[in-house]
């Protein structure tokens, strides 16, 4: 293990429109090439579309989508005596959130609507209703962990 000190967590400010830290993290993950204003317009545009389509509070629906995508358990590789085992481990809360955000954005980018706003709003609505690619990714992760439950005694 490294004896150096860990990098300090950076302070992030809540987003200006909703005052939500998670939306800011989501925005930062959507951002490409440092273009924050573009990412901001994409995320806010998607939340506006969600509000129009679902006729409900977009922030609550956003958090519901994140909760539905976040994995509770995942597998990690562990080498034991020449064999590599996929060992199921619990996911820390910070990692759960980071994975959920990453999976939602990747699933949205893989959709075939025309604009990113439409793709993101569609994926968020699907995830809030337990459908879509991001939820499928979470199910696959859980299925993998369940299949390798026999190796759970190799936990570290």
Swiss-Prot record:
Keywords, alphabetical: Ribonucleoprotein, Ribosomal protein, RNA-binding, rRNA-binding, tRNA-binding
A Pfam family: Ribosomal_S7
Record keyword Ribonucleoprotein present: yes
GO BP term, example: translation
GO cellular component, as recorded: small ribosomal subunit
InterPro entries cross-referenced by the UniProt entry: Ribosomal_uS7 (IPR000235), Ribosomal_uS7_bac/org-type (IPR005717), Ribosomal_uS7_CS (IPR020606), Ribosomal_uS7_dom (IPR023798), Ribosomal_uS7_dom_sf (IPR036823)
Record's keyword annotation contains RNA-binding: yes
GO MF annotations, alphabetized: rRNA binding; structural constituent of ribosome; tRNA binding
Residue stretches in coiled coil: none
Top-level taxon of the source organism: Bacteria
Family: Belongs to the universal ribosomal protein uS7 family.
Biological function: One of the primary rRNA binding proteins, it binds directly to 16S rRNA where it nucleates assembly of the head domain of the 30S subunit. Is located at the subunit interface close to the decoding center, probably blocks exit of the E-site tRNA.
Quaternary data: Part of the 30S ribosomal subunit. Contacts proteins S9 and S11.
PANTHER family (UniProt xref): RIBOSOMAL PROTEIN S7
Protein name per Swiss-Prot or TrEMBL: Small ribosomal subunit protein uS7
Source organism of the structure: Brucella anthropi (strain ATCC 49188 / DSM 6882 / CCUG 24695 / JCM 21032 / LMG 3331 / NBRC 15819 / NCTC 12168 / Alc 37)
